[in-house]
């Protein structure tokens, strides 16, 4: 089993910095009412190694700290952390393996986005500023169950249909 100690000082320094960023981003999810209870998560891929940092499973947002963030390889195996990683770890890892230009994943459960996603329809481009920002409708991925690569596969399949 690989551990964080197997990596050099550059990687360990980046892990420390990314843990701080990912923990802080989770607090922003609460601040902006984008999640409830323990649902949703943020992860970030490292630039210096094929590793990612993600929140632990089941830990309430108010208890998240940089040291509670879990470091995993891009197959979802834990490299460092005291807790089990998020139940969405396999999906985040799938996205990073299949979209190498992606360095961050944010999975929220905001009320309006969740309600819209239940319709299975793309969000129409109804404003000029949406067209400027997104280039057209905002794609909505297919429904998938958590706990496997399924959500990640749905995200990759959906996003690969659209130009960058």
Tell me what each language-model feature is.
Residues 1-164:
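Glycine-rich flexible loops
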């Amino acid at each position: 089993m690989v551990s964080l100690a197997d990596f050099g000082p550059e990687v360990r320094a980046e892990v420390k910095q990314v843990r701080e960023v990912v923990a802080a981003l989770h607090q922003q999810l609460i601040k902006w009412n984008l999640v409830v209870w323990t649902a949703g998560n943020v992860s970030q891929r490292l630039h210096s190694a094929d590793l990612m940092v993600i929140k632990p499973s089941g830990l309430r947002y108010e208890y998240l700290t940089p040291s509670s963030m879990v470091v995993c390889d891009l197959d979802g195996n834990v490299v460092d952390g005291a807790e089990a990683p998020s139940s969405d770890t396999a999906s985040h890892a799938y996205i990073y393996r299949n979209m190498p230009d992606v360095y961050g994943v944010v999975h929220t459960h905001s009320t309006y986005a969740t309600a819209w996603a239940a319709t299975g329809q793309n969000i129409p481009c109804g404003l000029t500023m949406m067209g400027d920002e997104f280039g057209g409708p905002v794609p909505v991925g297919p429904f998938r169950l958590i706990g496997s690569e399924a959500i990640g596969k749905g995200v990759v399949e959906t996003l690969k249909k659209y130009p960058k």
